[in-house]
Swiss-Prot record:
Pfam families: ABC_tran (PF00005). It catalyses: phosphate(out) + ATP + H2O = ADP + 2 phosphate(in) + H(+). This is Phosphate import ATP-binding protein PstB 2. InterPro entries: AAA+_ATPase (IPR003593), ABC_transporter-like_ATP-bd (IPR003439), ABC_transporter-like_CS (IPR017871), P-loop_NTPase (IPR027417), PstB-like (IPR005670). It comes from Streptococcus pyogenes serotype M18 (strain MGAS8232). ATP binds at G53, P54, S55, G56, C57, G58, K59, S60. Gene3D superfamilies: P-loop containing nucleotide triphosphate hydrolases.
Length: 267
């Protein structure tokens, strides 16, 4: 078995003016267990960044920390900085609901509301006091078009969201997330429950979305990371080992552990 130098690191950085988000010395603890170990990482605007690594490496925990989703776990504790527009959104005085408007989340399995397709999009807006039907109609159409779903559902908006296929439900969840105009979309293995055709459709949607959004995606699928992302980050045991342009990670990794992981030799 290969002995790796786990102190070896190769992590790129970006000019300040190109950043969508960054973390500094980010740690996540579940009780006494340290799940994320002091990660410094930057994300470039309007790019797709894939987080990869074996199960339990911390990539989903890291992703969930970015918009404070770990706050919902009683034993979780997050320290360090999460910098969005120069502001540390990990401060305890920050409104987590406002943070999540700017950093939207799409989960592993499609989770549409038990409502119509239309109401899935308008629910949050109506809760916020938007009553003008013309405004709501426009939000629905714009969001569904951006998620590449409008043409398939425009005549069925008042049918249950559960009548949609799995891939369509996931794109509905994307439409719901972008309807509140976030800057960043966080995706936690969004294609894991989808068939290959729906996965390709989702990736095509992501390519269109990155014109307007920064996307950070967790994936176990190496082919998906290689196809769909601009940058890839390799996590192992709570550490960020290597972070670079995707083509470099897959063709010229600087760390032996990264090279062996993406080529299927461990993990």
């Amino acid at each position: 078995m290969t002995e790796y130098n786990w102190n070896e690191r190769h992590i790129i950085t970006f000019p300040e003016e190109t950043l969508a988000l960054a973390t500094k010395d980010l740690h996540v603890y579940y009780g006494a267990k340290e799940a994320i170990k002091g990660i410094d990482m930057q994300f470039e605007k309007y790019k797709i960044t894939a987080l990869i690594g074996p199960s339990g490496c911390g990539k989903s925990t890291y992703l969930r920390s970015l918009n404070r989703m770990n706050d919902t776990i009683d034993i979780a504790r997050v320290t360090g900085e999460i910098l969005y527009q120069g502001i540390d959104v990990n401060r305890k005085d920050m409104n987590v609901y406002e943070i999540r408007k700017h950093l939207g989340m799409v989960f592993q399995r499609p989770n549409p509301f038990a409502k119509s397709i239309y109401k899935n999009i308008t629910f949050a807006h109506e809760r916020a006091g938007v009553k003008d039907k013309k405004v709501l109609d426009e939000i629905v159409e714009t969001s569904l078009k951006q998620a590449a779903l409008w043409d398939q559902v425009k005549d069925d908006l008042h049918k249950s969201a559960f009548t949609l296929s799995g891939g369509q439900q996931q794109r509905l969840c994307i439409a719901r997330a972008i309807s509140v105009k976030p800057d960043i979309l966080l995706m936690d293995e969004p294609a894991s429950a989808l068939d290959p055709i729906a996965t390709m459709q989702l990736e095509e949607t992501m390519f269109e979305l990155k014109k307007n959004y920064t996307i950070i995606i967790v994936t176990h699928n190496m082919q998906q990371a290689a196809r769909a992302s601009d940058y890839t980050a390799f996590f192992y045991l709570g550490n960020l080992i290597e972070y670079d342009k995707t083509r470099n990670i897959f063709q010229n990794a600087q760390c032996q552990s990264t090279n062996d992981y993406v080529s299927g030799h461990f993990g």
